[in-house]
Amino acid sequence: MKGTGMRLGPTGVAVAVALVAAAVVYAPRAWVSDLGPMPDAGEYATSARNLAHLRGFVIELLGRDYPPRYPPGFPLLLAPVFWLPGATLASAIYVVAAFAVLAVLLTHALARRLGGPVAGLLAAGALLLRTVFVDWSHQVMSETATVATATAIAVLLHHRAQHAGDARRHASLVTIGLVCGVAILMRYTNLVFVPAVAIALLVDARVRASPWRSAIALGTGPALALGVLALDDHVTFGSVARTGYHYWVPYWHTSLAKTFSLAYAVRQPGDAALGAFGGSPNLIYYGAYILLNVSSAWFALAAAWGAAVLVRRGNAGTRTVVVYAAALTTFLYLTYGFYFYQSGRFMAPLIGVFAAVTGAGVADALRRLGRYRELSLRTVTLAGTACLLALVGPIVEMRAVAGRTYIVRRLVLGASEPAIAQPMSAAVAAYEQTVPRGAVVVTALPLTMLDSVVKRGIRVVGLARTSYWASPQLERDPVFPERAEEIARSIESGIPVYTDAYSLSVTPTDPRYGPARAALKKFRLRPVETTRPTRLYRLDVD
């Protein structure tokens, strides 16, 4: 008698996918205590903590409250974690990781709808093998939440096209619109989700038959989100057309022509990204980023194969998803192609949908190769190459992903220290434990991390006009080169002045710290013993 064996149903498979995803993206607070790219990550975390404690939607700099640069959507999602006992700023990473797991589950669900169970598993694996996605999961930034919303929209579009009857059509559009609204509350430019969805919906003849009713249903969520943002901007900045970007970075937001320009697209960006293709024209940079990071050199052919297969199938669900993916890619590419600031993070919404299409492509190629009697030379060449690249890709990418995974680093390799050093949070902790009240700290640490130091009665002086120090809001607060003589007199009068190893490490590599380097030459630096894995220095004068 043959045994039936154990088979997981769809729910069991989804649970297994979620567990694997959690194992890949999880990181304890100590390993991510520097939060992510500053000042953005610090601003998200501090504003969320203040919302949770009913202090208002503010950030604290030098003991004063200021409005944040970013809209309130993502901090509102982070806020509940700060109700937990013992929560720190780094606790926000658990919400980020939860959205990363949700994004993987939605990618799996979308690919399963497009190409079957195998496609779902392949898509989830493709997403978890994207090193940028794992990196985003370890930073207190909005990328994983944006990936989840963009992929959720694709799942809802497919479900609506395949299953929703006339009675549920209106409700499904309202739901999609509400998800778009949540995305807009997190990032202003997520407004491009709305036209991408609208174009995808035109595939459905029922939408074309009642365009106004469909537009109202879809537009409810975005309209509510824009209303909330407009009210917040009006109350905070005095105008619905003025945002936190105008407040903190007025140079780039003095006019629409300054923020968006053809020159950024075809010559060079106003503010270039680091890494490969950074500083190249935006159209080149984002094209390369989509090909090499959102997809990859290993998965690009499989993604193209998957898109072609889905178009040929001709059913409403697959066509809607492909049109949505193409429209969203186009709108994001063009919007940020003309934008002054260059960052691959802006392409994050695409990564889940691309992984789903990749999974569908590889699954279809495997099925075709399995029907060996029907194979043509063209099928063998294209499908075989797509499968081979998709097989080699994980082998190549696995090492990089493993190096970013806590379980591998800690349990397999035995690492007891964070995989990536957290020098900023270590320096803050050293200041809190070592520096006495009334002392002065000269530092390049982000101001959003220094609130606890300021509250201890320690005066903070920036090393250079960078980040918040460069904004008009802090122009009356002198930085170190402007205050060097005063600090020397303070030292002579017995006031201790300190700096930290992190700040000294960034000054030689950043030209903006040139005046600070010159001013520091007038002082002697004496190491100070601390209980933290970092070093502080006390400034002295001859």
Regions found by a protein language model. Name each.
Residues 3, 156-167, 193-226, 230-231, ...:
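Perimembrane helix-loop-helix junctions
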Residues 45, 98, 136-137, 143, ...:
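Hydrophobic/aromatic-rich transmembrane helices and adjacent perimembrane loops
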Residues 39, 69, 91-102, 121-152, ...:
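Multi-pass, polyprenyl lipid-linked donor-dependent membrane glycosyltransferases
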Residues 25-26, 214-302, 390-400:
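Membrane-lumen/periplasm interface segments of specific transmembrane helices
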Residues 431-467, 496-506:
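Short periplasmic/luminal acceptor-recognition loop of GT-C membrane glycosyltransferases, typified by
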Residues 202, 207, 282-319, 329, ...:
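Hydrophobic, aromatic-rich transmembrane alpha-helices
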Residues 387-449:
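Membrane-embedded, lumen/periplasm-facing catalytic core of multi-pass transferases
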Residues 16, 178, 195, 219-223, ...:
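Signature aromatic-anchored transmembrane alpha helix within multi-pass, membrane-resident enzymes
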